[in-house]
Every structure is written in C-alpha cells, then in structure tokens.
Curated annotation (Swiss-Prot):
MF-aspect GO terms: DNA-binding transcription factor activity, RNA polymerase II-specific; DNA-binding transcription factor binding; RNA binding; RNA polymerase II cis-regulatory region sequence-specific DNA binding; sequence-specific DNA binding; transcription cis-regulatory region binding
Protein name: POU domain, class 5, transcription factor 1.3
Subcellular location: Nucleus
Keyword flag Cytoplasm: no
Biased composition (Polar residues): 154-168
Organism: Xenopus laevis
Ranges of residues in domain POU-specific: 202-276
Residue segments, region Disordered: 82-118, 140-203
Length: 426
C-alpha cells in the first residue's frame, strides 16, 4: 500500500557562495580534495618605502634596505581562479626598468607567481635623519672614490705662502687662542708663569723693567735693614693699605701676575722714597707692630677678695641676670659690663661642673664611697648541694636574692631516682 505524500518535496539547487564572499582559506574543507566552491585569494601588498630624497638609489654595500614581498599567509593553499581574479585592481610591486641606459622606476602590471613561497615582511629600513644622511652620503662618496682629493693647504701655513708644496696642516696651524694671547701680550695668571717674554707691556711698563725694579727693591730693603713684613706694615701706616709678608715675597720673586705687580709697583716706589728720606720710619713701624699685638691679646682681669665676695652675693641672688642688671652691677663695682658678663658665665659653668661631680660619686642605691669603705661587707655563702641558682647581693644595704629551686621532681616524676615506669603506669 502506498504511503500518502504528506509534504511536497521540491528539489533545491546546490548551495554556492557568491564570488564576493571571502572564506577562511585555512579551513580543511576548502582544500583542493573537497568539492567546494573556489574563492579568490587576496594579496596584501606592502610597497617599498621611498627614501626622503624621492627616487630609489642604487644599493650600496652599506645600505640597509629590506626586500619587498607580497603578503600571502597561505602560499601552499592556492585556488585555481586566484590568478584570474587578481589580475586587476591590486597594486603591483615597484620595479626598475632600464631605458636608454638610465635607471627609471615604474609599476609592473603582472602579479607575482602564486606558487612561490613568500614570507611576510615589512619593507622597512633604518636610516639617519635627513640632515645627517647627506653628510654621510658625501663621506661615503669620498671614500669610494679612492681619496684622490688631497686635503687643502692651510692658509695660515708659512710654507703655503712660499709655494713649497703640500705639507702637514696639523704641524703648521697655530691655535687661535695661543695666537690671540700672544698678540695681546698678557701674562698667565699662574704664579709659576710670571714672565711671558721680554716684549710684554702694560701701562707703559715692560717685563724687563719690572724685573729690574724687583731686584732693586730687594737690594735696598736689605741695605736699609727692613724685612718683608716691615714693608707690609709701612704701607699700611703710610697709605692705609697693609700687605702681608707673603705678597712682598712673591713680588720680589716675580711670582705674582704682571697685572698685580703693575698695581703694587707705585706703592713700593713711594715706600722706597720714604724709607730713604725718613729716618723715623723704622720706629713708626715698630710702634705699629706693638700696638697690633696689644690689640690681639687682651689683659687678664684679676679680682680681689672683696670684689669676688660682692660678685658671689649677686650670683646667689640671681644666677642669670639680664642686660640691665649687668649694667647696674658693673656700675656698682666699677667694672666693665663685658667683664661682669663673662664672670657670671664662668660662675654658672663652675656650678654645673660641681653638680655633675656630686652626681657622679653617688651610686644607684644612694650610698657614697666613704660609707662603703667604712661598712663591713659580708657575703652569704651558697650551699653546695642546693638546687637553686641564687647569688648573694654585692651591695651591703640590700638583702641577697635567692630564686626558688627548680621543681624538677614535681613536674617530671619519672626522672626522680628510685621510681620505675611500672609504678607510674600502675
């Protein structure tokens, strides 16, 4: 008996993808062994980056240009109609064509071979900045040319003016700093280079004249019986500007700079004239030296018994008086205010020292060293068979400290002698 037809089954056409739908090329069901629709494999072309100077240059041994490849992730999964669908619309790699002996660049209309295993890579190269690349390019051309160009001769070279030919420029060039220094004729500020040459001049004074004056100054100073320190004091007395003995010594030995020697020379010339004409100059210098020593050293103040007792009375009333009180005490005792102030400072420091000494002699227990020597020190003996670890106190006024014995037999009865384990376990 025939079964009734419940549904009308119409035949459907085979399901096919449109050419615009992109499928996954890595899926196994779209390989060539399966009857699946084909689709065009896309190419992602990454062109070579042009240089900053426009056209591509010929590769040199030092260039870092990377090779340009097309972006093909699946070179071994190729579809039959790939080449046909990719013939138009995709950019092609740049190529070089030679026409009439010149190198030119153009674009090729042919796509790369689909069967070639291409590796994805970026057309990227490392390069210097534009301002530095031009310098390096010029240097490279100079090196590759073989160095036929000879270095130019220095214009400062004396041999160049004579026309004797090429010579080493390093030996002939004179640094600009040294030449300008020689033209100015200034001395070095270092003390070891006091003489710069016989032609050094400043304010109409040459170095030879300065050397002669320094030698004359030393001879006259020794003949008149003056020391280098006396000259410094004499300049302070006569002209109000005192110099040290070291400065006069350096002037005589030409260890000062030429500029400083020119400033000091007029004062020394005036001193020479004053020393030759004034016989009392030596006495004036001697008095000035004595007064200077007296100003540096102050006389020590001595207090008699009555004055000291009065100061002690004021100290017992107020150990730290103020400025007004110090002035009143100084007027009362006919002393200077600074003397009274210093005495109070010293007296307070003395009081602090006494307090520290008294605290240092006392022990922690409050006994003084005299009481310890007078008392009889006795120590309590420690029993030999005792289980405690007590020690007698070393201080005589304190009782000895005995800690309780360790309860060994109570906590650990099995450790007591004469008791077996059977008795404990019972």
């Amino acid at each position: 008996m025939d079964q009734p037809i419940l549904y009308s089954q119409t035949s459907f056409p085979n399901f096919t993808y449109s050419p615009g739908v992109v499928q996954d090329g890595g899926n196994y069901q779209y390989l060539g062994n399966y009857n699946a629709p084909s689709y065009p494999q896309p190419f992602f072309h990454v062109p070579v980056i042009k240089s900053e100077f426009g056209a591509h240059e010929e590769e040199t041994p030092g260039s870092c240009h990377a090779a340009s490849f097309d972006w093909n992730l699946y070179p071994h999964f190729q579809i039959s109609n790939q080449a046909a669908s990719n013939s138009s619309g995709d950019p092609s790699p740049e190529g070089r064509t030679e026409e009439d002996g010149s190198v030119s660049e153009g674009r090729s209309s042919s796509s790369p071979s689909p069967n070639s295993p291409l590796v994805p890579s970026f057309a990227q190269y490392w390069h210097y900045p534009s301002w530095q690349q031009g310098n390096l390019t010029n240097q490279a051309h100079t090196l590759f040319d073989g160095g036929d160009e000879k270095p130019q001769q220095s214009r400062h070279s004396p041999t160049a003016s004579l026309g004797s030919g090429a010579s080493n420029t390093e030996d002939e060039e004179v640094p600009s700093a040294i030449s300008s220094r020689a033209e100015r004729g200034l001395c070095s500020p270092s003390p070891n280079n006091a003489s710069c040459g016989p032609g050094t001049e400043e304010d109409g004074m040459t170095l030879e004249e300065m050397e002669e004056f320094a030698k004359e100054l030393k001879q006259k100073r020794v003949a008149l019986g003056y020391t280098q320190g006396d000259i410094g004091h004499a300049l302070g007395i006569l002209y109000g500007k005192m110099f040290s003995q070291t400065t006069i010594c350096r002037f005589e030995s030409l260890q000062l700079t030429f500029k400083n020697m020119c400033k000091l020379k007029p004062l020394l010339e005036q001193w020479l004239g004053e020393a030759e004409n004034n016989d009392n100059l030596q006495e004036m210098i001697h008095k000035a030296q004595i007064e200077e020593q007296n100003r540096k050293r102050k006389m020590r103040t001595c207090f008699d018994t009555v004055l000291k007792g009065q100061l002690e009375g004021h100290f017992m009333c107020n150990q730290k008086p103020g400025a007004r009180e110090l002035t009143e005490i100084a007027k009362e005792l006919s002393l200077e205010k600074d003397v009274v102030r210093v005495w109070f400072c010293n007296r307070r420091q003395k009081e602090k020292s006494k307090f520290r000494m008294s605290k240092g002699h006392e022990f922690v227990g409050g006994a003084s060293p005299g009481s310890i020597q007078s008392e009889h020190i006795s120590f309590t003996p420690i029993p030999a068979n005792s289980q405690d670890y007590g020690l007698a106190s070393l201080h005589p006024n304190r009782a000895p400290f005995y800690p309780p014995p360790f309860p060994r037999n109570e906590l650990f009865p099995h450790m007591a002698p004469g008791i077996s384990m059977g008795v404990l376990t019972g």
